[in-house]
Amino acid sequence: VSFGTTYPDTRQKNIAAITRQVRALYPDAVVEEAVSSTIVRNAMKKREHIEAKSPTEALESMKKQGVTHVAVFPTHVIDGIENHRLKEAAKKYAGAFEQIAVADALLAKPQDYEDVAKALWESLKEEVGDFPLILMGHGTEHAADASYAMMEQSLRAYAKHEIYIATVEGSITIKDVIARMKSGPQSRQNGKVLLTPFMLCLLYTSDA
């Protein structure tokens, strides 16, 4: 289950790639894809004529196929609105299967922050070099938006580097981060930064 994206190339390189890996690991299992965002599902239908399933529709499909044990694997980064809706949908189907379990979002426990910080930095440090790093998360009005600030702290603690996390729809915006960079002891009014999404998207760089 993913939030989804309206960009076909990104969907194939990221979300679909995860689905392919799951199918390869469990070749005998019924694997359904679901998109939690209604807006994204509607856009996929209108632009690409793709009928993406909602989590409820995917569970209903599994029920009709006679599946008895279900593992729900969200690709959500934080335990925000979309992930809570997913868990509520799964609860409603508790009696439809012998067993149904929902995996945690990426950042659910304190140890997750340390593990993700290590994995992210080790994969990005050569590309980052001496440049400041900005990670862009989706963000949410949910209290789980605080997870991004906690993730920034964990990244800074592990990497010992100038790292920021901003969000598209959360409380910490890119403008907030730019203001921090300009007013901080390591002022970066000119020069480059590495800007990369903290979501299922592609890596890219940008001048700032």
PLM region spans:
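Solvent-exposed loop/turn segments at secondary-structure junctions
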Residues: 4-7, 38-41, 77-80, 107-110, ...
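Redox- and metal-dependent alpha/beta enzyme cores, enriched for Fe-S-associated oxidoreductases
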Residues: 18, 138-177
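A substrate-binding/cap region within the structured catalytic cores of diverse enzymes
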Residues: 81-146, 151
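Glycine-rich, highly charged phosphate/nucleotide-binding loops
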Residues: 47-61
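Short, structured motif recognition centered on aromatic/hydrophobic residues
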Residues: 1-3, 70-75, 132-136, 193-201
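Short connector loops at secondary-structure junctions
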Residues: 30-46, 108, 164-176
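An N-terminus-focused feature that recognizes amino-terminal "leader" regions
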Residues: 8-28, 40-45
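Conserved small/polar residues in nucleotide/adenosyl-binding loops
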Residues: 204-208
